């Protein structure tokens, strides 16, 4: 199995199996890419067309993944990872899919993963969206954390889930970028992916969103410098799984969220 020469801008190096997967995929070595997964792996990918929050296309098992990749065929893309965090067998990352010929970003992607005991990929849940700009390294180039990002995220989620919209928006810097998957109601953020620039825009968007009877629950998180990656699930008020999401947050020098990007799918993909 060949390893990848893929570079990671921020955070941790990719696990060997994930680096090999991207390297093989980018090199159109599709059987080699499938070999990076465990026998019973869950491979959940965004649809080729439609809305980015649409249900994932789920394939189970290395053999079926190999068949799927063979049908997929070669693509003119390369993966560039802008932020990666790994803790034990769990991880999450954000990156860009770039055009192999021009080097220009074509889309942003995010993923969560769980590794098997032998280091192969046991669960891979991916998301894609239009390019989210700026990248984490541009939002805050410092390597020093001004606060504990997960605490600020919890503060934000609790306020949002309790419909305290000004308190939720106060967790963000005045010049924040907030990039969110398409809302069901286009009155909140328009059609397609929603981006709000600045706290005032974000506060107004939270009010348009209104009260929703859901609960955000974080199942993995890790911070590197001022940058955080997390995986979460959304439950309804009865505790049933509705959706899965990955979010990236970058703090400013005052410990407020200067950049927040999230990716979501419904229904959720259970963890192992």
Language model features by range: what are they?
Residues 29-30, 49, 121, 164-165, ...:
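Disordered low-complexity repeat/linker domains
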Residues 11, 30-89, 171-224:
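A solvent-exposed, acidic/Ser-Thr-rich amphipathic alpha-helical stretch
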């Amino acid at each position: 199995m060949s390893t990848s020469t893929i570079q990671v801008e921020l955070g941790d190096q990719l696990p060997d199996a994930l680096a090999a997967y991207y390297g093989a995929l980018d090199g159109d070595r599709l059987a080699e890419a499938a070999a990076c997964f465990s026998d019973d792996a869950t491979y959940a990918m965004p649809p080729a067309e439609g809305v980015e929050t649409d249900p994932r296309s789920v394939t189970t098992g290395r053999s079926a993944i190999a068949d799927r990749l063979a049908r997929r065929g070669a693509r003119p893309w390369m993966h560039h990872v802008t932020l990666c965090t790994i803790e034990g067998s769990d991880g999450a990352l954000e990156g860009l899919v770039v055009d192999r010929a021009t080097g220009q970003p074509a889309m942003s992607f995010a993923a969560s993963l769980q590794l098997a005991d032998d280091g192969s990929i046991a669960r891979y849940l991916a998301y894609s969206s239009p390019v989210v700009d700026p990248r984490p390294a541009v939002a805050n180039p410092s390597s020093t954390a001004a606060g504990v990002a997960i605490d600020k995220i919890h503060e934000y989620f609790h306020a949002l889930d309790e419909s305290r919209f000004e308190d939720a928006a106060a967790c963000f810097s005045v010049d924040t970028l907030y990039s969110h998957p398409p809302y069901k109601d286009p009155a909140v953020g328009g059609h397609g992916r929603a981006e709000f620039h600045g706290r005032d825009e974000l506060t107004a968007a939270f009010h348009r969103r209104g009260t929703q009877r859901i609960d955000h629950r974080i199942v993995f998180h890790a911070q590197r410098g001022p940058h955080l990656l997390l995986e979460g699930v959304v439950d309804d008020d009865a505790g049933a799984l509705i959706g899965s999401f990955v979010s990236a947050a970058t703090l400013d020098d005052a410990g407020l969220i200067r950049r927040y990007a999230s990716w979501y799918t419904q229904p959720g993909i259970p963890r192992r």
